[in-house]
Amino acid sequence: MKENNFFNLDFKFFFVTPYLIWLSFIVFYTFNSESIKAGELDGFIKYGNDSSTYLFYAKNLINFDFSNLDIAKLSYITLIAVVMFLKLNLTTVIILQFLTTIISSFCLYLIGKKIFSKWVGLICLSLFLTYLPIQLRNFYLLTEMLFINFSIILTYLVFFKKEKKILILLMTIFVLFLRPQSFLILLSIALSIVLFSKFNKNYNFILKLFIIFFFSFLLLIFTYIGINYYNLTDSLSKGMIWGYSFETNSLCYKECISGLTNPSIYEKNIFGLLLYVKDNFFILTKVSIYKIILYFSGWRPYYSFAHNVFILCFHIPIYFLFCVYFLRLKKFDPFEIFTLFYVLISAIFIGVTFADWSGRYIMYILPFMMLYASKSLFNLLLILKDQLNTKK
């Protein structure tokens, strides 16, 4: 039985099984969403807090009204606008999200297969399709699911299909304007290419310089937007989770962290931000650590005990297996460098901004962590198999 024979009958059965489970979940949820707290569908769609905003901007876009347009989410707004212009049902967007989930899951499998083996790819594929918090996002008229899917597809193309230059360029532009955090994954890809190019002569000097300057420029733009449009100085005072006070276990609108100086007295520029951080360094450092813990754990004080336990029971093994893989590693390939950068930069980003209400930000990096956790799990299964064979 050859390892690389994809069309082996036994493997075909194992490969299809995660998709059958995934499809069963979709059907079950579609017809039973009303029995899940805050999960009821409107037809085939789950509307989030920002859905109405996207619809509003999409209608404006159709009417060539570009005032107050959210550039950071322009790709998703444009997609909705096209669907509305063609007079298609909004369910079309949800169907597209499901289709891209199928494609991205297959790309995860291919990445696992190329780096390790088809069985590692299969384990990663299974983890991705059966992790319900991510898959539930397919039903939401929000940017998250497309961002997760296109991030996976883009990284597959960049690292394993470099010849698809036009497709990579188009997808990079689409991802860049899909979510405000899009620069994190693009920056991670760029850094991994630049760093790996020091050990690989295939990347020329001009390409390396272009990547450095291009993403330095992007970083400056996003820093400017963060300070002026999103008011980062004020954001730092809004708590570990935006607008939630852990001291009172309730919403807060002004001071969510006690002991901070008034952010309104600082100028809205990089110097004002740095001065604010200096004046509140110890409090902000402690809060940043808490934010990162909240980010990785997925635990939220307002979620049910069962929900928090479910999340922790999935996250902790994934993180443990992920760390086991990299602690044993002595030499890094480009995709490993990218993954480490993406995880690290994302954690830092949360530390200096805020953890989100629903825990969805961790979903952006989880598929890549699942990949290396799958390799550790596969190695563990091989050890168990050898021990069982030895006893026989």
Label the predicted regions.
Residues 1-36, 198, 203-218, 335:
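Start-transfer (signal-anchor) and selected internal transmembrane alpha helices
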Residues 96-100, 123-153, 158, 175-185, ...:
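Multi-pass, polyprenyl lipid-linked donor-dependent membrane glycosyltransferases
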Residues 105-130, 148, 338:
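Transmembrane-helix signature of polytopic, membrane-embedded enzymes
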Residues 91-92, 276-345:
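Membrane-interface anchor segments at the N-terminal boundary of transmembrane helices
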Residues 95-115, 153, 317-325:
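Transmembrane-helix motifs of polytopic, lipid-linked glycan transferases
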Residues 50-91, 287-295:
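Short hydrophobic/aromatic helix or loop-helix immediately within or flanking a transmembrane segment
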Residues 74-78, 86-106, 137, 306-313:
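Loop-to-helix entry region of an early transmembrane alpha helix in multi-pass inner-membrane enzymes
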Residues 165-180, 186-191, 219:
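Membrane-interface alpha helices of multi-pass inner-membrane proteins
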